Amino acid sequence: MKKILITGGAGFVGRRFVKFFLDKGHHVIVVDNIAPLTGGIDPKNGWPLFNPKDYKNFKFHNEDCRSWFNRSKDKEIDYALHLAAMVGGREIIENNPLAVADDLSIDSHYWQW
């Protein structure tokens, strides 16, 4: 059993990875701030695809991953899938330079962690 960190694990792609690894028996840690447009997730019991209460090896941190990276000293993580990003696609990239700067900040915190 591996310990897997998934940032952005509440997003469309992330929650599919979460379920995949949970079904394989791995310990999964998700860090996600549940941004608007994520799909109406209730962190405690409203996840599409699975019910968090069905898995003892699931841990969810409802926060910006930058804060989690700054605080976490967990070096026992076997794999990290960094999927956290600002939600909005091409429109955000082309029309909101501040959101792009936020995305770069998120990535920077990941690589420094």
Placement of each model-derived feature along the sequence:
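N-terminal Rossmann-like NAD(P)+-binding domain of SDR-like oxidoreductases, especially those catalyzing
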Residues: 1-113
